[in-house]
Curated annotation (Swiss-Prot):
The chain crosses the membrane at residues 3-23, 38-58. It comes from Pectobacterium carotovorum subsp. carotovorum (strain PC1). This is Cardiolipin synthase A. GO terms for cellular component: plasma membrane. It catalyses: 2 a 1,2-diacyl-sn-glycero-3-phospho-(1'-sn-glycerol) = a cardiolipin + glycerol. Gene3D superfamilies: Endonuclease Chain A. HAMAP family: Cardiolipin_synth_ClsA. It is found in: Cell inner membrane. Residues 219-246, 399-426 form the PLD phosphodiesterase domain. PANTHER family: CARDIOLIPIN SYNTHASE, PHOSPHOLIPASE D. Its EC number is 2.7.8.-.
Length: 486
């Protein structure tokens, strides 16, 4: 009997090390950044069983078999739709400013569609203003309303949006809502989905979360886009979730969330529409294709119109697209670069680009929250401050709430606004959306918003930062090492 137990023990030991060796080999064979690979290996060898389960659940980017099959089926029809869209040559910009030309060229070559001109664009800096405009647009909607959000939390003015959507559906407007399962977990636990469905609204839970699915698909892959489409000609996007900041996470100790949204009228709504349709088909298997731009209602030739390029990122979209776009934007800066983000955990390449911009004389400012709702990300962000300050980057810590706006302004001309945080999750993983605007007028509007953020922030003093307690440096470096996994 003792021999039997000895054999079993050796088999278990052999299987244990074989499993670790197999996962190690899998990590090494995957084409990934060295810091990410090293961080995963450290976790696996310090906490083997936990590390292996974590890696198999979160370490590799895969949609799952069903979504992958749907994605492969929808691309031919999507590609055909894009080819037909390109026949509307008058909607595409043929010239860009010097600072924006490299980025627009990159986007056109990688995504197959260039920047679209003739759009009217309005910045919304408060939740109340955004909801007021949205309620008016929903009331006037005649054909369709589509929405996708990471978080939808009932309460406050959000109830008015729900009521307005129900009224629109009852008068014959096709309404579809796509919400991330993890972000909108409270919404799906309440009666609101059934109330909307009874009224005729299609409500879909995207990327459902449960333990069984952890072995079929990466569970921290999230639908992080925020898009509203109305009658295929009006669109909203930006950093705002469908939550009233007066009631959202008020026990987190970070204050109200501060967001930025853009309201767009024009042909670029069609580009946002095809992205929404792809997301919808990937989740439901139902095909939707937006109609082409209506030349009778969209003023393509207006001199005041904005040229906008849409960047969609996530599984199934051009790899590293948003990361390349950010790098191109930073390297294009000649005079000034202003970035706002709630979560700052950049890649080594992006960190190097930002520092290099400051070192070659560009006035670089980064605005981040003073208090963060994510303790892990907050500590990891601080680990980058020393290198940034040494390069001459100005770091502003926003003190009037949790600054959730994601924006980049280059030389007052090139603007990027959307859902992308400057962290690994947004850069490499989640479904995200970004608007690229080549326009000095819009750049001036965005600069005013960013200057207001700076006025409500504290400039980080390099000398005081160097004198912070030693224990804080240790914690920062610890989280810095694991930053590729955050």
């Amino acid at each position: 009997m003792s021999t039997f137990y000895t054999v079993i023990s050796w088999l278990l030991v052999f299987g244990y090390w074989l499993l670790i060796a197999g996962v190690t080999l899998r990590i090494l064979m995957k084409r990934r950044a060295v810091p990410s690979a090293m961080a995963w290996l450290l976790v696996i060898y310090i906490l083997p069983l936990v590390g292996i389960v974590a890696y198999l659940s979160f370490g590799e980017l895969h949609l799952g078999k069903r979504r992958a099959e749907r994605a492969s089926k929808m691309w031919p029809s999507t590609a055909k739709w894009l080819r037909e869209l390109k026949e509307y040559r008058r909607i595409f910009a043929t010239e860009n400013s010097e600072v924006a030309s490299a980025l627009f060229q990159l986007c056109e070559r990688r995504q197959g569609v260039g920047g679209v001109k003739g759009n009217q664009l309005q910045l919304m800096t408060t939740f109340d203003d955004t909801i007021k405009a949205l309620l008016r647009d929903i009331e006037l909607a005649r054909s369709n309303i589509e929405m996708v959000f990471y978080i939808w939390q009932p309460g406050g003015l959000v109830e008015q949006v729900s009521s307005s959507l129900i009224a629109a559906a009852r008068r014959g407007v096709h309404c579809r809502i796509l919400l991330d399962s993890a972000g909108s977990v409270q919404f799906f636990r309440q009666h609101h989905p059934e109330l909307m469905r009874t009224a005729g609204i299609e409500v879909v839970e995207a990327l459902k979360v449960n333990l069984f699915r952890a072995f079929l698909r990466r569970m921290d892959l999230r639908q992080h886009r925020k898009i509203i489409l109305i009658d295929n000609r009006i669109a909203y996007t930006g950093s705002m979730n469908m939550v009233d900041p007066r009631f959202f996470k008020q026990d987190a100790g970070v204050g109200q969330w501060i967001d930025l949204m853009a309201r767009i009228e024009g042909p670029v709504a069609t580009t946002l529409g095809i992205i929404y349709c792809c997301d919808w088909e990937m989740e439901t298997g139902k095909r939707l294709l937006p109609p082409p731009p209506d030349v009778n209602v969209m003023p393509f030739e207006q001199e005041s119109g904005h040229t906008i390029q849409v960047i969609a990122s996530g599984p199934g979209y051009p790899e590293e697209m948003i990361h390349q776009a950010l790098l191109t934007s930073v390297y294009s800066a000649r005079k000034q670069l202003i970035m706002t983000t709630p979560y700052f955990v950049p890649s080594d390449d992006l960190l190097h680009a930002i520092c290099t911009a400051a070192q070659r004389g560009v006035d670089v400012s980064i605005i981040v929250p003073h208090k963060n709702d994510s303790v892990l990300v907050g500590w990891a962000s601080r680990a980058f401050f020393t290198e940034l300050l040494a390069a001459g980057v100005k770091i502003y810590q926003f003190k009037d709430g949790l600054l959730h706006t994601k924006s980049v302004l280059v030389d007052g001309q090139l603007s990027l606004v959307g859902t992308v945080n400057l962290d690994m999750r947004s850069l490499w993983l989640n479904f995200e959306i970004t608007l690229v605007i080549d326009d000095a007028g819009f750049g001036s509007d965005l600069a005013c918003v960013q200057e207001d953020y700076i006025a409500r922030s504290r400039l980080l003093n390099a000398t005081q930062w160097q004198n912070r307690p030693y224990w804080q440096r240790i914690v920062e470096r610890l989280f810095y090492f694991f930053s590729p996994l955050l």
